[in-house]
Amino acid sequence: MERSLAVIIPVFCSTTTVRQLVTDLKEVFGPSCRLHIFLIDDGNEASVRKYLTENCLLEQVTLITLKKNYGQQNAVFCGLEKAAGYDYVATMDDDLKHPAQELYRLWEKIQEGYDLVYGVPELDGKTKVKYSAGSRIRDILFSCGLKCPAGMRVSSFRIMTKEVAKDVVTGHCGDFFYFSAAALKKKRKVANVTYLPQKEQRSSGYTLKKRIRLFLGIVWNYSLPFGRKNTQPLYEIDEIYPRLMVLGGSQCQLHALQRAKAQGMYTVLADYTKCPAGAAYADIHEPVSTFDADACLAAAKKHWVQGIMTMGTDQPVYTAALVSEALSLPSCLTAAQALLVTNKKYMKIRLAETGIPTVPWMLINKDTTEEEVKKLRPPYVIKPLDSQGQRGIFKLDTAAEVLAHLEQTLEFSRCEEALLEEFYENDEMTVSGYISKGKLIILSVVDRLVYPDPVHIGVCIGHRYPSVHIGEYETIRTISEDVVRVMGLQEGPFYLQLLKGKNGIVVNELACRIGGAFEDVTIPWLTGFDLLDAVMKNALGHPVDVSGYENFRCDQTEKEVAVQLMFCEPGEIATLTEREELLKLPFVMDCGYNFREGSVIPSLENATARFGHAVITGTKETIAENIDLFYEKLSVKNTEGKEMILRLYPEKKERYIV
């Protein structure tokens, strides 16, 4: 598993060296780990902020500007709080005094099992005199008053494990902070690595008077049991860059918000619901509809976002493109392209014009007659042009039923027309991939399993990988590549629903997003390609590296995945198994609930009734047993003590085959 490293760089009045340092770090650590750099601007000067935002906001960089100068130690504390979750955390100065190549040596040293490694300069005759004037007193103080090993030197150039970083942050109280004093309160395995500093260094800002005050602060706050007082915060944040807007805060978008938070981004969540799941991970929750492009645009302007994205949902893709176009933000799609892949009218017209196979269809409105409907063969399927989650979709037997249901379908649409199709008996498949420079990389082909309701059709109850029709991979690939071509897609995620029936494979619909069956979890496990990371890079205008996937084939793997999109009997939930208990099962990669105790689950008519999800992994030999073990662990009971969970895919003890 790839290790992660966060590098914290306090910045004070630097307008010449930071870009070079960031570039050096990315070059040195690029192939070694998942790197993220936190620049903490501790001066709050307009010229410095301008330099940092215009020159240093590269990929893998977060810029945090503080409201005033709080000092290097407090800036480090800010970075430590934001870097939670990384395997290792390093701190270094902004003036190139600490070379990136030397940090790599610290990185190698800590892999030997150390908790904390300091980089310290080699001492020649001249440096030794300067060092002994102040730093030696500090080191003696650390050796005598704290648990620092004798002879150990400390500095602002260091790398630590995530456990040390967490201890330092959670164990702090008061308005004085000094990293080494906080870290060495406990016994640690510590090491020094010496290096030759750069010739040109910024002179230390510590006068003798400041050093004495600092030493007294260390003694008072870390050596005396009565010294520490909790009075005021160590810092206040003014701005965080980049600023990412996420459209939607349900379980389907939760991982994007969690990832953005882990990377130190400032996130603005647009979701009209009062308390969406994602709000806990967002910096700002704007209660606006993701369908309302004007409201989302106003929110994006208000918070000066640098990127906007969504996942797991269709219509916000169009909203994101409109906002991006209005604000000149990065986007894989123009507004016109986004309309093509989110509105079934324009989608069907383009597919028909270019010869892509689909089922027979027509557009209907309130003036449509039964005779016009009868131009298609029954049974019929009626759909809104611009909705999602199977809302307003019905399978109907007669033209009269179609016209009777039209008004109900249009309730889920902003259009005055609806799509009418001939029903095609089929197995549904979903293709997920990524498009780079116009070329599609297919990452998975799954069976999209649906609830067998005779009227409310298309409600997905699970994904099965690999598809039982994977033997037709070449046909699937050809159709998928043709769709990419005729839609003019050049970059970004790709999602295609196919129908396999007696007349072959036809296209149902497509989207330019990560699917709603947690493909951001399954695809990295199956392929190693981080699809969520790619989409977030798209939103911020960063390049996506697809090297190694140019000739990738997803039909050559022994891994299997069963995504459970779970539903329950309608009623009020009294008790349910805690999510953490299910995640203890070694084959459960992810799971989540859309309802909690006290929630009332509606009847199953569309995807809004979904209780939750689980991503279950295995092999051909183990997947069926793993699914059974999961459902044996899961319990959802109503107020009468009866189990509510519906075992839809596959039925209990049914073998994992068609």
Annotate each predicted stretch with a short phrase.
Residues 1-4, 14-16, 20, 181-239:
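Hydrophobic helical membrane-anchoring modules
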Residues 41-50, 96-97:
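A conserved acidic beta->alpha catalytic loop
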Residues 33-44, 64-65:
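Short beta-strand/loop segment that forms part of the nucleotide-sugar
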Residues 67-68, 73-83, 88, 100-177, ...:
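Acceptor/aglycone-binding surface of glycosyltransferases and processive sugar-polymer synthases
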